[in-house]
Each structure stands twice: as C-alpha cells, then as structure tokens.
C-alpha cells in the first residue's frame, strides 16, 4: 500500500478497520455480557483516540486530499482501494468516532444478545468511516451499501413494535435509490477507462474521484446525459439526507430504532447524504449543480417547512424529533446548493451541529423512555420538579437545536442563510428558510414545555428517577462540544476553509455547458 | 492378413482429459459401490476424482489446444468454467452426504450419477461442434432425469422426473432439429466453420437472414434456453426444483445452468457473430423478461424451494447479460458471476437441507422462524447467502453483478443494465423476507424442530461463506484469472 502521510503508517485504513477488528474480538466474547460492554466502549474510545492524530496533523493550508493511501485493488476494472481526507470529511470522520463510544455507552441496558448489538454498532462505524474516506467510486459504493446491513439488524432486532415494517422500509428505500447510483458509477468508470486508455494513460484509476473530476468534461457527454448521471447520484443522496419528498422512511426508522441506533442514524448516517452531495454531485457535476441549485433549494425549503409543521403535529416525542431532522437536514441541502464558501461551510458545520444536538435529544428521549415506557407528550409534565438534571440537559439540547445564539446551531444556520441569500438561490427561499427557524423554536419549545412544566402525573410517568452518573457522562461531552462550537466556531471552520474555497473556485470556474453540445 | 490394419483415431488426451477422466472415475465409483455400502468411501473417492479432474485442467492451463477434428477444445474459458462446475459438484456431494440416508435414499448410485452428469457438463463446456454439444447436453440430461426421480417413493419426485424427462425430450428434439437446419444451410457442424461459411455468404452477397438458418439458430437456442431456464422456456423449473431431492435441485440450479450457458456463449459468439445484432436484440428482450419474471414471481412465493427456483430463473437472466455482451468483459463477468452464483445458491440450498426433516417435502418460509435463536450460525450463513443473492456488498453477489452490469453497459446494452438493477431491488424484497423471518420473527412451534448441520454439510456451508466473502472483497483474484478470456476460433 502506498502511503503519503507524514505519520509513517496508514492511519486512515487503521481507523476504518479497527472497529471491525473489535467486532471480531467481540464474537469470541459470547456469554460475557458485562465484559463485552466494557470492551466495546473501550475499543470504540480507542478508535476515537487513534483518529485524533488526523486532526492534529491536518494541514490547514492544503486544499487537496491528505493522508492519501492507495493500492491497486481490481486493476482489471480500474478500481483502486483509495482513502483520503480533506476539510469536508475531516469533521465528519471525527464526529463518527466521537459519537460511536457515546452510543455504545448509552446502550448499557440492552440485555438481549448484547454481543451482537455491540458488534453491529462497531461494524456500522466501520461502514460510515469508509463512506467518508473512500476516494474511489467502487470502494465508496461498497461502504455506502454496507452501512445498510448493520442498521437493518439494529432496527429489526432491537427496535419497537413496528420494527420489521420500519427496517424493511428503510432498507428497500435506500437500496432502491442506491442502485441507480451504481449505474451512474458504472457508466462514469467505463467512460473514464476508455478515455484514459485512449490517452495512453494507466487505466487503474478509472473509478478515482480526482481523475473523474479532471476528465469528466473530456468524455463528450451531452447535457442530458450529464443530467441523468447527476440524478443517479443525487437521488441516492436525497433519500439518505432525507430530502422532501423522499423522507418517509426516516420517521419510521427513527421511531422504531433502539436509542443507540437512533443516535447513530441521526448523528452520522444522514450526514452521508449531505457529504455525498458535496463530494459527488457538486464536485463531479458543477455545471448541473449550478443549473439545478434553485429547484433543489426549493425541495430543501419545502422540506424545512413541511418537516417543521409535521413535527409540531406529533404527539410522540421521538417522532417529533425525527421530523425535526427532516426540517434541519433541509437547511444543510440549502447550504450545499448555495455553492459558495459561506453556504458550504455552514452546511458542513451544521452537519456536525445537527449530529450533536439531535443525537443528544435522542439520547435524552431514550433515557426517559427507559424509565417511563411512554413517549406520548401528553403523558408528560412537570419534570422540572422531579428530575431537574434531566431537564437541564433537555433544555440545553433543545436550545442548541432551536439555534440559540451562543450555541452551535445558531452558527450553522446563520452561515447557511447568509450563503443562500448571497447566491442565485436568492432571498425568497432564504426568507422561507428563516420561517423554518422560527417554527423550530415553536415545535421544540412545545416539546420542552410539555415535558418540563405543567402538572406531574405519577401514574402516567411512573418510576422516574434522575439521570445516573453514566448518563450524565454520556451527555456532558456532547453539550460541552455544542457550547464550544457556538463560542469558537472559527476553530471548526478553519480546517475546512481552504478546501471549501478551492471547491467554490472550482464550481465558479466550471466551463458553462453549451446547449446541445 | 497384412492389408487389414486398424487405424486408431488420434486421441488428444489433453483436450479430452477432464471429461474422460471423470467419466472413467465415475464408472470406478459405480463398481466400488457394488462391494461396499460405506458412504464415506464413495464420497471420498468421488471427491478425489473431482480433485484429480481439476488438476488435469491446471496442467496445461493457459494454452489453447483443439482436438478431435476441432470438435473439442481445451482453452482457458473451458477450464475455468469446468473448475467452477467441479467445485459446485464437490459442494453438492458434501451437502448431500447426510441428507440422502436421512431421507431413506441411501443408494450409492447417487455419487456416480452426479459424476456422470458433471462429466457430460465438462464435455459440453469444451464442445466446439454442434454434434459434441448435443452429446454433452444428452449425457448430462440423462443422468439428471434419474437424479430428479431419485426420491421416487415420494410422489413429487416422480412427478418432477417425468415432467423434466418429457420436456427435456422436447428440448432435445428442438436441439437436433436446429442442428439439422443449420447443417442443411451451411453444410457444417463445426462452430468456427459455420462462421467461416457465413462470412463467405457475406462476401458473395448472400443474405444472412435466411429463414431456415434463423429457425435453426432459434431452435438450438430454445433447447439451451430450456436448460438454463430462460423465460419463456422456464415453466418446468419450479415444479422440478420443488420435487427433486434438495441436493439435486441445488446441483441442477447451478451446474446445468453453467454448462448450458457456456455452450450458448460459444454457439453465439463463435458460430454466429455475423448475426450479433439480431440475437442481441431478441435475447435482450428474453433476458429482460427473465430477470423481471423470475424476480416478480418470486415475491409471491411462500415455499422456499419454489422461491429459490424463481430466483434461479432471475439469475439466469443476469448471466444472460454476460453472454449477450459478447465481449471479453462479458465472458470474464459471466465466469465471475457463475462462480459467485454457484457458491451462493449451493450454500442457500445447504441451509434448507440442514432444516429438512424426513417426509417433509414442502418447505415453507415460516419454518425459518426463530432460526436466529435456534442455530445462529446457520442463520448467519443464510443471511450471507441472501445478501449475496440480492447483490449487497461486500459479498460475491455484488462484485459479480457489478461485473455483469459493467459488461452490459459497455456493450451498449444499457437498458438491460438498468432493468437489471431495478429487478435487483425487487429481489432484495424477498431475500430480505427470509432474513426477517429468521432473525426477527419468533417461532410458533412449541417443540423445537431439529436441525441437521452435520460435519460434511457444515464444511460445505463454511466453504461457501468464505468463498463468497473472498470473491466479494478480493474479486481481483478471480478477475485476474478470468482476464483476457477469448473464445477459441479454430479454423
């Protein structure tokens, strides 16, 4: 394997495959539930620790891929094993390694088939890290589809009452959308292969994203063909994000998933869609992205409003937060298709923010559900007096999610709207998005109020006890990060600045398509 | 007396080696069977025979030798497909080993019969002449008719055998008639010579779309299409698959298909490249219909054997894409697909065998309930098989589908590639249902049903799982081997 970083070892491969090693070790720890839990927590923390050198050795001024490593995997097809990372994927990788130990720790109460549960979470981590790091379309697709398998079992085996319906819907919805991306990948790889062979260049990089970015204009594709290719990728990512109107798998999956599953789903899995839009839709098809920025922004804005309204209408707390994800992820798509530095920065930052705050909300709901076994908002009330520590954390996460200045959500949403306003998307859409911010305050405060204030009913919410030390320890790192991002956002935007500036320039300089060419 | 000399025909043992050795070995096993009733001896002997046959292919691997007046050929493609068929046969014997006596089918003839069938397949794969193709098809079919009815005290097995025999007889009739028509028009039976003859037609301005020639080609393809259960010649498949003893079903679903497809590949690409636009169009429609029909009807099945039967029809459609691509990429993708499908389908049937009780011919989906709790390893293996059949990474099923769609797209059969991925999604629905049933639904039965994961069967399942993951993660090993497969065009 060829390695280009200064660390002297292939750190990205190590980070990607360490979780899988942990999962294999767990397979040999059957029957030792307690030990397995501690091992999984320790191992995922180790993965996080191993991923930290990436942050500390990341060169802020370099626009291209860093820590680049590759070997010729399937030379006959032009497929390489290639991992690399830039300012866009840096924080998403760290978010994944950061959230996974917390999710594992939150699953302390999973009594049934504990080992399998923990193994699946580690495998899920591997798949997600692979998605953020793969720089070859074939490799990317393998990781992309692989992430379906652990989540499918997590929801299907440890989920709620309608878990089978939810998990099959989740799998088929995403699988159906992804196979069109496969066609797109095959078409691009073949075109590139032919082009490289024609130019007398080595064909082993036919599926490489960088080579494709450089060559795609030389393939002689017509406007329609480019648009179809763009769509084949976009649909897969839109379902994952999820963008209105292909969001319907999300509420079902979220509501039925076990807490740790919901956390991973909300915090990381959805971000794969946003990441894919930037990495593939925008980088490979800058002209189409520009041309279709407004229609896509329209879908995003509809999603923002629609998600918000539906969220307000929910009586189930988990469903309420699930629909709030639809609304919040709309902002991210809006930021991406602003296609300027500010918007893209806001979108990437907001992916992290949403991961932290919604992850925390799902954790909190899971914690209270474990005690009361009800998620009906109507059953709750007056928790201020009974479980104050829980309510403090709930207030904090709610405020972060609403976008209170000083906390993380505000920075991201502000940047996105600034970017969208300043782009061809224009002020009308931005104004509607701003309405979404207000609505977010309405439905999230409705939820908070319903839980925290009002009369307390011992009958409907029995056995309430305040958060344990373990639960506080899970939530604290999330909340600290929300505050830090809110106050020192520049530390987080700084590493992605160079990459995003380069991307903005790349999109702006993309040769405009001549109709009928 | 000196003027009477017996001229021995020139026998090229390299060319004939694989099928001939296996045939002779099968007869030996048949004789040994008369003196011993120890199944272990028969199994061991059979496996040794398969191993030696595979080794015979390795001796001259890479060289292309034609023999017997160019009626048979020894080339990379032939050897590669033969290896896959031999591996499939070995797996079949392993998973059948404990099943047959459990079903009271302890006749030792089972082993030589399977070897006879395989020998016919190897012969078919190496055939480059219409006559040898016919011999190959018949050799394998006759052994298979007997094997289908092997559980003959069971009503369904007898029914399946008769059905297969009657329809197979029709197909053989079509084959002979087609051969006769082609011979009548071109005066040749050798595939390469037919191609030469047709190119002389072209140079002299004689029309290629002669109705009698086209009918001949069509009849041969009907017969081969029957063997691979291509729509609309698939109707026998579900009934025969359901009725035959499960290991035989498993064997038929992979080996027969593989051999017949290999023959189809040679027939179309070597003899009729001149008619390529015609057969690509016509068979493109058949391939699309096969993929769609197999997958859509499989959704409605509750009987597992029938579901796998329809799924095997669908997979024939995918393999057909590799045949139709008619390119180096297509041939290479076809062999990878055949390997992946062989491992996966045999594995899936092996799990069914492990669950099949005596006298319980019908196998319902609901019987899999709670398998994840009862025998998690078996359920895990079945999960791998189902994901591989659906084509989900990182399994062999995905890598091979990728290769097939890539070859199809490259050959401008883009509409087939798109139909292929759409039908893959449909297939995911019913493969997932198996997984859901195993892991997420509990059994209603009060007493646990036994499972028969014996040593030999487990070995077969483990080999299949490891093979699937290996081909899925490192397809390069096999694509390197299957690289630059060019079908021999002898003079």
From Swiss-Prot, chain B:
Locations listed in the record: Cell membrane
> How does this chain sit within the bilayer?
Multi-pass membrane protein
Q: One short Pfam family name for this protein?
A: Proton_antipo_M
What keywords is this UniProt entry annotated with?
Cell membrane, Membrane, NAD, Quinone, Translocase, Transmembrane, Transmembrane helix, Transport, Ubiquinone
EC class of the enzyme, as a word: translocase
Quaternary organization: NDH-1 is composed of 14 different subunits. Subunits NuoA, H, J, K, L, M, N constitute the membrane sector of the complex.
Q: State what this protein does.
A: NDH-1 shuttles electrons from NADH, via FMN and iron-sulfur (Fe-S) centers, to quinones in the respiratory chain. The immediate electron acceptor for the enzyme in this species is believed to be ubiquinone. Couples the redox reaction to proton translocation (for every two electrons transferred, four hydrogen ions are translocated across the cytoplasmic membrane), and thus conserves the redox energy in a proton gradient.
NCBIfam families (UniProt xref): NDH_I_N (TIGR01770)
Q: Which PANTHER family match?
A: NADH DEHYDROGENASE (PTHR22773)
Q: What is this protein called?
A: NADH-quinone oxidoreductase subunit N 1
Query: What does the organism's lineage look like at the top?
Result: Bacteria, Bacillati, Chloroflexota, Chloroflexia, Herpetosiphonales
